[in-house]
């Protein structure tokens, strides 16, 4: 890989918060034909760092016509398991609430003790960038209208790259969050025909010409 011999590899390969989210997002892409598994991978990535939460509008739009319930079921189930794990491992209620807030990112953007590009720039400039990032995340729910696997990969890479511009800690340094998806986007073949309606594995329901509900074959 292009970062194999870089200082980033030596410093952060063993860091769970650097290496694991990107790996889980790649596995979510690999399992895109199985919405339940893809949702579980995305939910687990969200439990590691909360930034994959901003991928939900894009992924939900991809599965909108088929597979949405299975995708959300996988994501919600995995997040629920992680919350239960937090409850079991926390020493008291206050510690559980604090860890839960950290997991879901329920806090005002940090402006002190930052590490990375924002250590040298005025923190006030982060807020319009953050607002633009949230707008981009929500815009992926409706644009482009029909999403294929290529859209899923490129949109996910763009959003995870976008987090680097406002991430307070090591902002701009978490290459492993977006670089695997970016490489998949660059070297992908034509994926215009890989849409959820035609490639998903698993049963579903549809109506035939007589209006009867039948089970869709896998």
Model-derived features with residue positions:
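Primarily membrane-embedded glycan-assembly and transfer machineries that use lipid-linked glycans
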Residues: 4-36, 63-175, 179, 185-191
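Membrane-interface junctions at the ends of membrane-embedded or membrane-associated helices
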Residues: 32-40, 60-72, 186-218
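Transmembrane helices and adjacent periplasmic/lumenal helix-loop junctions
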Residues: 40-61, 168-173
């Amino acid at each position: 890989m292009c970062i194999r011999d870089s200082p980033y590899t030596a410093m952060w390969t063993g860091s769970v918060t650097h290496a694991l989210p990107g790996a889980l997002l790649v596995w979510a892409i690999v399992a895109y034909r199985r919405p339940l598994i893809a949702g579980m991978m995305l939910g687990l990535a969200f439990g590691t760092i909360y930034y994959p939460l901003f991928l939900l509008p894009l992924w939900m739009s991809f599965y909108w016509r088929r597979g949405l319930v299975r995708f959300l079921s996988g994501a919600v189930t995995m997040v629920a398991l992680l919350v239960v794990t937090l409850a079991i491992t926390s020493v008291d209620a206050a510690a559980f609430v604090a860890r839960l807030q950290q997991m879901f990112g329920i806090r005002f953007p940090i402006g002190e003790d930052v590490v990375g590009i924002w250590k040298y720039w005025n923190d006030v400039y982060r807020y319009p960038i953050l607002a633009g990032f949230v707008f981009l995340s929500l815009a992926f729910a409706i644009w482009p209208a029909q999403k294929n696997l290529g859209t899923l990969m490129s949109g996910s890479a763009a959003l995870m790259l976008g987090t680097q511009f406002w991430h307070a800690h090591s902002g701009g340094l978490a290459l492993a969050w977006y670089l695997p998806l970016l490489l998949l986007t660059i070297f992908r073949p034509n994926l215009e025909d890989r849409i959820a309606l035609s490639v998903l594995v698993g049963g579903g329901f549809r109506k035939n010409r007589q209006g009867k509900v039948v089970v869709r074959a896998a």
